[in-house]
Amino acid sequence: MQRDQIALPFQWPVADRDEDFLVSDANRDAFTHFTRWSLWPVMATLLTGPRKSGRSLLAQIFVRKTNGRVLDHVEDRDEEELFHAWNDAQARRRPLVMIGDRPPPAWKIRLPDLASRLAATPQVAIDEPDDELIAQLIVKLLADRGIAAPPDLPEFLVPRIERSYVAIQHVVDTLDRDILANRKRMSLAAARHALQEAGLIRRAQRRA
């Protein structure tokens, strides 16, 4: 008897093009903030938002255009490192993008000079995804893996999955594995079955 084939995940290319960052009301303020960087009071900004929200992608697109620098996970970095990076950005006139889960004072800063510089630094946040962005991301992330989403799939999933970027990623990963394992074209029925088995969808809920 032939053993069931194990679906092995492929390493998909990392998105880094302008069109890879999808804009909706959930992230429009952040997107606009970076297009108007010449108006920043200092050559630095703090970008916060949930993990998997595209915050690193937006920052990388920006620094590629401006010859800037990105520092991710700033809450966990040495304060002296942040202090010198901020000063260096001003001296070189190269914008610094600091990325974190939350803005200060949610993470305690002991170095007074760093605290004063961050207080003068503009901050912008990406919110949890809205319905429009959830639908766009499902279609795009599946397309990035060579999978055509059925036209009715986004509308079905939007009210049934958790409203978070991590949940969207789990949904796409699950559908990708199901397609690889079963070697068949995706349908709404097959997607619903795979996601129900994984515990990723619930009864449709009315969005506020």
What are the residue ranges of the model-derived segments?
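Pre-Walker A adenine-sensing motif
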Residues: 27-39
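Conserved C-terminal helix/linker of AAA+ ATPases
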Residues: 179-197
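Conserved P-loop NTPase "ATPase switch" module shared by AAA+ and STAND
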Residues: 65-81, 85-88, 92-103
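Short regulatory helix/loop adjacent to the ATP-binding pocket of P-loop NTPases
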Residues: 104-119
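Dynamic helix-loop-helix/coil hinge segments at AAA+ ATPase domain boundaries and subdomain interfaces
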Residues: 6-28
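Walker A/P-loop nucleotide-binding motif
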Residues: 42-58
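C-terminal helical "lid" of AAA+/P-loop NTPase domains
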Residues: 155-159, 166-180
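Conserved AAA+ ATPase "SRH/arginine-finger" region at the nucleotide-binding site
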Residues: 121-133
